[in-house]
């Protein structure tokens, strides 16, 4: 447990020492999205009944920031350690594979939630928000951050250089996030794309998170929770298996 706490502290301190880049910058980016999309579309479209577009958009931006930054934290840390050669010291430490994964994912969750809280604190002034089911907000925020933190560990193990990690993020994480209903309700999509959206696990994270604010969602929050939980369990098993095998870590 001491080893886990030490690694978790190291990973948390790593992003907090450069909080201007790792926390403040994503908040500014989310603000730009809100100003552009909220200003142009507010009053012109309605995604949920009785909910202004800007109000609808804010939970999506918060969750998008949580997910993307949780992934960035664990993936960048691992690839940086691999390239610099200091990952060997973590692998040689008396830590179980589960403890290593938990420390990286825990720090990723911390950064994701910190960024999400920052985005919410700034954007909440621009619209009226309700909190119909705050428990769902917390559950999906933490679970979503943990999933992306685990995906970041997998990506960091797989990638051998920053270019490969960037490809993973640009061709998988960002499209999956943007196409998950951040800016729109999937019910507004044509039937084909509506069906495709239901195969995107990111959609269930964002939809369940938004339900906590408005009590309305495209899918039952219980269904979303079940799908997201299974997805997390599968990713966790994959990550631990890769760590046990030492895949691209021991050479």
Describe the role of every protein-language-model region.
Residues 1-135, 139-251:
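Hydrophobic transmembrane alpha-helices and immediately adjacent juxtamembrane helices
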């Amino acid at each position: 447990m001491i080893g886990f706490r030490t690694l978790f502290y190291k990973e948390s301190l790593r992003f907090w020492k450069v909080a201007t880049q790792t926390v403040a910058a994503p908040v500014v980016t989310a603000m730009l999205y809100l100003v552009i999309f909220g200003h142009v579309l507010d009053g012109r479209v309605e995604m949920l009944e009785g909910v202004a577009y800007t109000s609808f958009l804010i939970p999506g931006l918060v969750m998008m920031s949580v997910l993307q930054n949780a992934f960035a934290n664990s993936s960048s840390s691992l690839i940086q350690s691999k390239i610099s050669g200091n990952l060997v010291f973590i692998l040689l430490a008396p830590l179980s594979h589960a403890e290593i994964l938990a420390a990286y994912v825990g720090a990723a969750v911390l950064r994701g939630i910190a960024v999400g809280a920052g985005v919410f604190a700034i954007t909440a002034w621009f619209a009226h928000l309700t909190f119909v089911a705050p428990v769902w907000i917390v559950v999906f925020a933490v679970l979503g951050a943990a999933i992306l933190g685990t995906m970041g560990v997998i990506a960091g193990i797989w990638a051998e250089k920053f270019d490969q990690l960037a490809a993973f993020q640009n061709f998988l994480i960002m499209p999956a996030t943007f196409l998950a209903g951040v800016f729109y309700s999937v019910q507004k999509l044509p039937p084909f794309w509506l069906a495709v959206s239901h195969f995107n696990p990111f959609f269930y994270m964002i939809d369940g998170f938004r339900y906590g604010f408005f009590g309305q969602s495209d899918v039952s929050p219980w269904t979303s929770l079940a799908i997201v939980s299974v997805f997390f369990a599968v990713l966790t098993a994959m990550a631990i298996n890769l760590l046990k095998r030492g895949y691209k870590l021991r050479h």
